[in-house]
């Protein structure tokens, strides 16, 4: 199992980006979380699952929901032991 950490930059706060992320993650069977960062413009996403599914998820993060304007996605990978039981939004 792999872990994807993505910091999504651009107009991604206040446009339902975290809700979109959660919906797509659940649809793909991924676990982890999405949270706004204190920068006021970035969202951090942690997702665990099979690498092929995580790559599909990453494509979705790069496009985002209709009102989002994703400018950049910083990505890092690691292995995981399944730290999360579901996918949720952190507040």
From Swiss-Prot:
PROSITE patterns per the UniProt record, alphabetical: ACYLPHOSPHATASE_1, ACYLPHOSPHATASE_3
Lyase listed as a keyword: no
Domain Acylphosphatase-like: 3-91
Entry annotation: catalytic residues: 18, 36
Entry keyword set: Hydrolase
Top EC category: hydrolase
Pfam families registered for this protein in UniProt: Acylphosphatase
Catalytic activity: an acyl phosphate + H2O = a carboxylate + phosphate + H(+)
EC nos: 3.6.1.7
GO function terms (MF aspect): acylphosphatase activity
Family, similarity comment: Belongs to the acylphosphatase family.
UniProt xrefs under NCBIfam families: PRK14450.1
Entry-linked PANTHER family: ACYLPHOSPHATASE
Name by which UniProt lists this protein: Acylphosphatase
Source organism: Dehalococcoides mccartyi (strain ATCC BAA-2266 / KCTC 15142 / 195) (Dehalococcoides ethenogenes (strain 195))
Gene that encodes it: acyP
